[in-house]
From Swiss-Prot:
Tagged with keyword Mitochondrion: no
GO biological process, one term: DNA-templated transcription elongation
Described function: Necessary for efficient RNA polymerase transcription elongation past template-encoded arresting sites. The arresting sites in DNA have the property of trapping a certain fraction of elongating RNA polymerases that pass through, resulting in locked ternary complexes. Cleavage of the nascent transcript by cleavage factors such as GreA or GreB allows the resumption of elongation from the new 3'terminus. GreA releases sequences of 2 to 3 nucleotides.
A Pfam family assignment: GreA_GreB_N
Record flagged with keyword Transcription: yes
UniProt keyword list: DNA-binding, Transcription, Transcription regulation
Designated name of the protein: Transcription elongation factor GreA
InterPro entries according to UniProt: GreA/GreB_C_sf, TF_GreA/GreB_CS, Tscrpt_elong_fac_GreA, Tscrpt_elong_fac_GreA/B, Tscrpt_elong_fac_GreA/B_C, Tscrpt_elong_fac_GreA/B_fam, Tscrpt_elong_fac_GreA/B_N, Tscrpt_elong_fac_GreA/B_N_sf
GO molecular function: DNA binding; RNA polymerase binding
The family this protein is said to belong to: Belongs to the GreA/GreB family.
Amino acid sequence: MNREPMSMHGYNKICAELKQLKEVERPNIVKEIDIARGHGDLKENAEYHAAKEKQRFIEARIVDLSEIISNAQVIDPGALMHNKVSFGSTIKILNLDNDKEFSYTIVGSVESDPAKGLISFGSPIAKSLIGKSKGDVASIQLPNGESDFEILDIYYKEICFDEN
């Protein structure tokens, strides 16, 4: 069983989605299926088949979210030392091949948003950097090949998960 590290924010987000699916979406789709069933022949009833497909999606998502929750390892990144790259660390790195600087915060997979600089602990970048210290150089496999990155800084700052 693989533990899924995440912040309390990520855990609450998954729990809220699961609650919405179980308490709102699931009952609504049952009603939609009943209404569509009343429209006659099920073999050629597009509404019925669409509702059943939606029901399969909802049930599969409920299973997925339940599994994530059961494997969740809620971590308070503010309570961790950030002298080495770890969950919740914000890191500044320098691509030694092109002198470009990047800043990322390592979060759980359900919280990641690369466009906002939030990368999953399971991403190739995070995997290559976790456990390293300021000044270390890491080779990271990128889609266009391998590049060397120097860790310029490691620190903790409150993670902004702005949902907008």
